[in-house]
Swiss-Prot record:
Keywords: Methyltransferase, S-adenosyl-L-methionine, Transferase, tRNA processing. Pfam families: tRNA_U5-meth_tr. Gene3D superfamilies: 2.40.50.1070, Vaccinia Virus protein VP39. HAMAP family: RNA_methyltr_TrmA. Belongs to the class I-like SAM-binding methyltransferase superfamily. RNA M5U methyltransferase family. TrmA subfamily. The keyword Transmembrane helix does not apply. Its EC number is 2.1.1.-, 2.1.1.35. It comes from Campylobacter jejuni subsp. jejuni serotype O:6 (strain 81116 / NCTC 11828). GO terms for molecular function: rRNA binding; tRNA (uracil(54)-C5)-methyltransferase activity, S-adenosyl methionine-dependent; tRNA binding. It catalyses: uridine(54) in tRNA + S-adenosyl-L-methionine = 5-methyluridine(54) in tRNA + S-adenosyl-L-homocysteine + H(+); uridine(341) in tmRNA + S-adenosyl-L-methionine = 5-methyluridine(341) in tmRNA + S-adenosyl-L-homocysteine + H(+). This is tRNA/tmRNA (uracil-C(5))-methyltransferase.
Length: 357
């Protein structure tokens, strides 16, 4: 979430100075700061296409003024994206069928792989052979989308390996999953949580908003059992696959919203999706939440404040502060970390560790 409504905070030092004041009612100790490299840190990039005089350009449009900016290079994008951009553009410019009614492209990369998604305002079935040729000639994992249609060439799944405390964690996911877009910072966030857990008495872990298991797989060895919830069926399927990739057997995944989980734990409602999971068998010492920008609603806060330790990963300092007003009635902030996810922008990721008073 952007801090631009509060001022022009771009550097990590400026963000740190603001956050210290903004959260002073909850935390007065030293913040842990995690910097990112300045260039080629972002693994996801989305661009528009601009058509002029029968040729094609990458472009971005100002969301307020709608002013057009021709893009030739993205210094914040992963090196694999930067290297592939001119190759793709040259190929598209030479194929009129691929170029016609093409309006956008999405790049996604991991340490090992790259995929692209081309977005069209026309029936992509009509250019299926052209798209297949593009994928084969440029040796690229390609997805094409138009209204109600999706075509995949080679594969849409990407493999990722994260290095966490001398361990390698293996993942597979696709473009539809929520992905931390700065791999270096993602590794630092997970490592920060692991270092806290190293000092803790631990039983079982409850994780909400687990996605494809980004935190889950790395944290599982610290606990006897893990219950991780997520509403996306696709994410759950990837999470189960990632358990197999890492030979992890102590994680139980449930496709539930946080509100549904709250009802289930309070025994106010039974869910068929929990038929193979006995909630009474868990003894949660820690809960991890990584919510969307809207933060936690009251039902989730009421649920998690029952547990001894809370790890809160936030992409929105504004909703984090609102949630801490409630959580501070039962818990104390023990650690506060700032992760410069998007360098030289007003955006900031926060990590907070709370323990029961």
């Amino acid at each position: 979430m952007s801090l631009e409504n509060f001022g022009n905070f771009l550097t990590l030092d400026e963000k740190h100075s603001f956050i210290k004041k903004y959260f002073k009612e909850f935390y007065t100790k030293d913040f842990k700061l995690f910097a990112s490299k300045d260039k080629h840190y972002r693994t996801r990039a989305e661009l528009s296409f601009y058509h002029e005089n029968d040729t094609l350009f990458y472009a971005m449009f100002d969301p307020k003024s709608k002013k057009k900016y021709i893009i030739e290079y993205l210094d914040f994008a992963d090196e694999k994206i930067c290297a592939f951009m001119p190759k793709l553009l040259e190929y598209l410019r030479q194929d009129n069928k691929l170029k016609e009614k093409l309006f956008g492209v999405e790049f996604l990369t991991t340490k090992q792989e790259l995929s692209i998604t081309l977005l069209y305002h026309k029936n992509i079935e009509d250019i299926k052979s052209n798209l297949e040729n593009l994928s084969n000639i440029l040796h690229i994992n390609l997805i094409a989308r138009s209204k109600g249609k999706k075509l995949i060439f080679k594969t849409e799944n990407l493999r990722q390996t994260l290095n966490i405390q001398d361990r390698k964690i293996f993942y597979e996911f696709n473009n539809d999953c929520f992905i931390q877009p700065n791999t270096t910072i993602n590794e630092k966030m997970i490592t920060w949580v692991c270092e806290i857990l190293n000092t803790q008495k631990r039983m079982d872990l409850l994780e909400l908003y687990c996605g494809y298991g980004n935190f889950t797989l790395a944290l599982a060895p610290f606990f006897f059992k893990v219950l991780a919830t997520e509403i996306s069926k696709s994410n759950i399927n990837f999470a189960l696959k990632n358990c197999k990739l890492n030979n992890t057997t102590n994680i139980h995944f449930a496709r539930l919203s946080s509100e549904e989980l709250s009802l289930a734990i309070k025994k106010e409602r039974e869910f068929f999706r929990l038929k193979d999971i006995r909630l009474d068998d868990f003894n949660f010492s820690h809960v991890l939440v990584d919510p969307p920008r809207a933060g936690l609603d009251k039902s989730v806060i009421d649920l998690i404040k029952k547990y001894e330790n809370i790890i809160y990963i936030s992409c929105n300092p504004i909703t984090l502060k609102e949630n801490l007003k409630e959580l501070s009635l039962t818990h104390r902030v023990e650690e506060f970390a700032l992760f410069d996810q998007f360098v030289n922008t007003p955006h900031l990721e926060c990590g907070v560790f709370l323990s029961k008073v």
